[in-house]
Design a protein with these regions (language model features):
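Metallo-beta-lactamase
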Residues: 64, 85-90, 95-173
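Well-ordered beta-strand positions
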Residues: 3, 72, 80, 92, ...
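Active-site neighborhood of phospho(di)ester-bond hydrolases with catalytic His/Asp-centered motifs
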Residues: 2, 23-31, 50-53, 91-93, ...
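Active-site HxH/HxHxD metal-binding segment of metal-dependent hydrolases
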Residues: 6-84, 162-170
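Aromatic/hydrophobic pocket-lining residues that form the small-molecule binding cavity
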Residues: 4, 35, 131, 135
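Conserved beta-strand hairpin/beta-sheet module of binuclear metal-dependent hydrolase folds
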Residues: 1-18, 100-110
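Short, flexible loop segments at the rims of nucleotide/cofactor-binding pockets, characterized by
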Residues: 1-4, 27-28, 67, 89-90, ...
Length: 173
């Protein structure tokens, strides 16, 4: 499960209704709207691991809502959950510990890349310069994975290369 948000009961009900099992919780960054339910979901799922990059461990409590993490991941790691493999790409900018996760043809971007936009950089740990570098890196990825952002509709990396003003600016340098 990627970025379960802060309503664990809703998430756990949806998992149960579909007959699924949570094997791990993968957090793209440490902000409360992505991590708030991680501890409860982990406990309800047999204490499955909760992954977060070290870069977000020092976030102010008003942003992190008491981060819960049992495992760390960083650039180049591959996390296997069942039959799925998630390749970790560090993409700082929205926060120092932001990561994107590539699983087959799916790219989970958290708050790094949205449909025709990108995440804010004005929170503690945010950096406009690092965000531009991360967007340029994503733009340079091969292929056209489906982008599943932390907020808003899904898109494709190809669509964002063509239409996202933040990404096109980052590509120009």
């Amino acid at each position: 499960m990627v970025d379960p948000g802060y309503e664990p009961n809703t998430v756990l009900s949806a998992v149960a209704e579909r007959g699924l099992k949570v094997g791990a919780v993968l957090l793209t960054h440490g902000h409360f709207d992505h991590v708030g339910g991680a501890k409860e979901i982990s406990k309800a799922s047999g204490s499955c691991p909760v992954y977060l990059n070290d870069g977000d461990l020092e976030l102010p409590s008003r942003l992190s809502c008491g981060i819960y993490r049992t495992a760390a991941y960083s650039e180049g790691d591959v996390i296997t959950v069942g039959e799925a493999e998630f390749a970790v790409m560090q993409t700082p900018g929205h926060s120092m510990g932001s990561v994107c996760l590539l699983c087959g043809g799916l790219l989970f971007t958290g708050d790094t890349l949205f449909y025709r936009s990108c995440g804010r950089t004005d929170f503690p740990g945010g950096s406009p310069k690092l965000m531009r570098q991360s967007l340029a890196r994503l733009a340079g990825m091969p292929g056209n994975p489906t982008v599943l952002p932390g907020h808003g509709p899904a898109t494709t990396l190809g669509h964002e290369r063509e239409t996202n003003p933040y990404m096109t600016k980052a590509m120009r340098g």
